[in-house]
Amino acid sequence: MAEPGKKRLRASTIIAAVLYVVDAFILSLPFFALVLLAVVLLYFLPATLWALRSDRRLARVRGAKAGIYLLAAVSIFVTLGLQNSMADRRAVKLGDACLAYRAKYHHYPRNLEALVPEFIPSVPVAKYGLLGGNRFIYLSRQDDREPMLWYEALPPFGRRFYHMESRSWGYLD
């Protein structure tokens, strides 16, 4: 039979893994990462230090739990950062394809699907997630001014705009 400390660590690992998947791939928000950081700093750190005074075994279990939750929080932030970097690279490729389309046809495409298959093989997703914020939004203007291309870096707000002609980024919350 497993020791009580190992059972608690196994439960903490499962909880941390579930929160990681929910936060990084379903919500695409650092909500649970921030909650986990707060729990580690406000509960586990003081509780571990307090337990060190009398029960080193309990302190080790609490320290291990703190490490598990801290690792989950950091992993969420890293995953979301990697997803946003991936979306940035894909937006630049879409912008380049729009500029190539304009050079050939003397106007911007009406939508991103007009770029397929001549300029890009398919319209990519911005990020991977289940609750939105995973696609690029493209708005073409009638007067052939630069179209708008953005994705939700931090749903439901936090839009990251790519300016094709200047090859620069803007941010709107």
Residues covered by each model-derived region:
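Short alpha-helical segments used as structural interaction elements across diverse proteins
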Residues: 5-7, 57-62, 87
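N-terminal start-of-chain detector that recognizes signal peptides
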Residues: 66, 73, 87, 111-112, ...
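Intrinsically disordered, low-complexity segments enriched in polar/charged residues with Gly/Pro
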Residues: 78-80, 87, 124-125
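Alpha-helical transmembrane signal-anchor/signal-peptide segments
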Residues: 83-104
